[in-house]
C-alpha cells in the first residue's frame, strides 16, 4: 500500500511517469522505500532545498509510521 501511494505521488510530480519505480526493502530497523525516476526528473522530486523530498517523506511517515524511510536513488550513479 505504501509503495503504491508513494508511486502515485511521485508520478504526479515528474515529466516521465512511466520511469517511476518504487521498491521496498525490509531492514532490521524498519522498511526502506527506494524511489527511482528518470535522471531528468530527479531535481523535481528533490525540489528546491529538498522541500519536495521532505514533503514526500513526511506523507509516507504519516501513513506508514516511524519505521519507514524513503530514499531517492540516482540511477546515473548506481554501480
UniProtKB/Swiss-Prot annotation:
Cytoplasm recorded as keyword: yes
Arranged from A to Z, the UniProt key words for this protein are: Cytoplasm, RNA-binding
Highest taxon of the source? Bacteria
Q: Does the keyword Secreted apply?
A: no
Subcellular localization, as worded in the UniProt entry: Cytoplasm; Cytoplasm, Nucleoid
Write out the similarity annotation. Belongs to the KhpA RNA-binding protein family.
Name assigned to this protein: RNA-binding protein KhpA
- Which species? Streptomyces coelicolor (strain ATCC BAA-471 / A3(2) / M145)
**What gene name is given for the protein in this entry?**
khpA
Amino acid at each position: 500500500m505504501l509503495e503504491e501511494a508513494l508511486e502515485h505521488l511521485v508520478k504526479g510530480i515528474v515529466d516521465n511517469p512511466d520511469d517511476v519505480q518504487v521498491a521496498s526493502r525490509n531492514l532490521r530497523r524498519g522498511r526502506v522505500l527506494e524511489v527511482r525516476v528518470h535522471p531528468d526528473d530527479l531535481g523535481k522530486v528533490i525540489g528546491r532545498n529538498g522541500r519536495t523530498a521532505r514533503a514526500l517523506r513526511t506523507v509516507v511517515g504519516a501513513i506508514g509510521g516511524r519505521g519507514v524511510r524513503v530514499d531517492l536513488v540516482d540511477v546515473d550513479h548506481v554501480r
